[in-house]
Amino acid sequence: MKNLTDSFVYLGHWPSAGSFGFNTDILATNPINLSVVLGVLIFFGKGVLNDLLDNRKQRILNTIRNSDELREGAIQQLENARARLRKVETEADKFRVNGYSEIEREKLNLINSTDKTLKQLENYKNETILFEQQKTINQVRERVFQQALQGAIGTLNSCLNNELHLRTINANIGMFGTMKETTD
């Protein structure tokens, strides 16, 4: 049991203040390394992330502009349909006796088809905006995850060399051996 507590005391030992040198204790250097890696990721990743978001924002704005242009075209079609409607109404006054019900049906069909077209264009615009937003969010998430993963792998590869890795394994095997002896 004494060996077990000694190993924990050894692992918790920090070098005294005022000394300078390389600290090979992996438990003491990980917070420092992680803070440096996080600082570098934030510093360099922020620009990439901002550029990615700006590009997505421009795509979404272009999509909105295109949808607005389509909407304006539909409004123009509506105005044309209304002009045709006025023309049909004047002709309806002339031919009221011969075909009033048929003209009314054509009028309603024009209004309904134009209204339906406007609704479809509005739905298309909203779906396009939602799709682009989801696509942008997913790509940003994927990019951030990849950058964090690459940073973590780089940190692990730079921190663990073969000698340090073997010493850590041997220390853990020794701890497990002493734990087994104390339990027996």
UniProtKB/Swiss-Prot annotation:
InterPro entries the UniProt entry points to: ATP_synth_b/b'su_bac/chlpt
Keywords: ATP synthesis, CF(0), Chloroplast, Hydrogen ion transport, Ion transport, Membrane, Plastid, Thylakoid, Transmembrane, Transmembrane helix, Transport
Major localisation: plastid
Additional comment: In plastids the F-type ATPase is also known as CF(1)CF(0).
Name of the featured protein: ATP synthase subunit b, chloroplastic
Family: Belongs to the ATPase B chain family.
GO (cellular component) term, any one: chloroplast thylakoid membrane
Function per UniProt: F(1)F(0) ATP synthase produces ATP from ADP in the presence of a proton or sodium gradient. F-type ATPases consist of two structural domains, F(1) containing the extramembraneous catalytic core and F(0) containing the membrane proton channel, linked together by a central stalk and a peripheral stalk. During catalysis, ATP synthesis in the catalytic domain of F(1) is coupled via a rotary mechanism of the central stalk subunits to proton translocation.
Compartments in which it is found: Plastid, Chloroplast thylakoid membrane
Subunit structure as annotated in this protein's UniProt entry: F-type ATPases have 2 components, F(1) - the catalytic core - and F(0) - the membrane proton channel. F(1) has five subunits: alpha(3), beta(3), gamma(1), delta(1), epsilon(1). F(0) has four main subunits: a(1), b(1), b'(1) and c(10-14). The alpha and beta chains form an alternating ring which encloses part of the gamma chain. F(1) is attached to F(0) by a central stalk formed by the gamma and epsilon chains, while a peripheral stalk is formed by the delta, b and b' chains.
Native organism: Lepidium virginicum
Transmembrane stretches, start-end: 27-49
GO molecular-function term, one example from the UniProt record: proton-transporting ATP synthase activity, rotational mechanism
Topological type in the membrane: Single-pass membrane protein
Matching Pfam families: ATP-synt_B (PF00430)
